[in-house]
Amino acid sequence: MGYLRAHAAQPISTEHRRALANRPTALAILEQCNGVVFAPTAEPLECASATYRMGYGDAGPLVQQWSRWIRRRLTVVGLCWEDEYWFCVDDDGGCFVVGGHQSEACMRGPGTWVETIAALMDGVRLRPVLEPWTWSVVSYGETYRWWDRRVWRP
């Protein structure tokens, strides 16, 4: 995951925190993960595209296109679980994860990873699938913890 670390954004500024004051849910989600909060200038999906391409074929162009669409709606980006995953929160408080194993780590939706991202962009609210190694996540006013061992479907 050196690629992600090398392209990490600067920690979120005080001004950006003030701008997010009316969106406490986004910050609460990220603080639940690791408390490492970044501004959305990190372009997380483009940073992760090299890892994705290695494992799943030449997905770079698709990932970058989704990155451009998603970045317009990003509120904050967090780096979590030993720097391996980007935890992103969009303007509506929705959240999703990208990282080295994106098809498993992203929000679970109907179809492939890119179809899941497309659903996010269309405003479909997806619930996370939590694995035993993930942290508790607060999303849409509900708390999910790994020991619940529940699989949520949209």
Residue ranges and their predicted role:
Residues 1-86, 128, 140-154:
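A surface-exposed partner-binding patch
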